[in-house]
Curated annotation (Swiss-Prot):
GO terms for biological process: proteolysis. The keyword Lyase does not apply. Its main location: cytoplasm. The active site is at E80, C143, H168. This is Pyrrolidone-carboxylate peptidase. Homotetramer. GO terms for cellular component: cytosol. It catalyses: Release of an N-terminal pyroglutamyl group from a polypeptide, the second amino acid generally not being Pro. The gene is pcp. It comes from Cupriavidus necator (strain ATCC 17699 / DSM 428 / KCTC 22496 / NCIMB 10442 / H16 / Stanier 337).
Amino acid sequence: MRTVLLTGFEPFENEPINPSWEAVRALDGERVGDAVIVARQLPCVFGAAIDTIGELVDVLRPALVIAVGQAGGRAEMSVERVAINVDDARIADNAGAQPIDTAIVAGGPAAYFATLPIKAMVRDMRAAGVPASVSQTAGTFVCNHVFYGLMHRLSQQPDGDVRGGFIHIPYLPEQAARHPGQPSLAQETLVKGLRAAVATALSTRADVREQGGQLH
């Protein structure tokens, strides 16, 4: 049976919970087709987060890796297109580090694209009743850091057959209640969206060709 690794983050920036971890752990052990989902938590710490996901890839040998992170202020689940080779932290991570204009991998490529069928995933997430879109930026905090580190690691795999990517998700309602005016999605909606995303990523190699870009 194939393994799908889903990762979420520990809480950060004084939040008591992180919706990415709450959503992925709800899917831990669930079967999707011929695969089983394994959920693991990452530290919200530069360097350590990449080390942790790299160790998980080595131990679990998954067919698919989807890292998930919180994006407070976004109204939809955002399937990320690209990770860039820079850390530029607006706030400190959970270990107090705040790298600015620092390469994630010295001498590494400027960017990596997700190797998932991102547009097909968005299409099927929407078909399941979940607000979703393709995102053109994963930011420059620990989420992008992990996304880039993951894709760099996967690019070094001998068989090169492990696919990966990143999904940003909004606040949960209980978080939005502490941030007036901020959008949120219920946990059951987030779980439904991730389930649809995993199923499509497992069954689809070639992405659909349809509009998913933005003007700015």
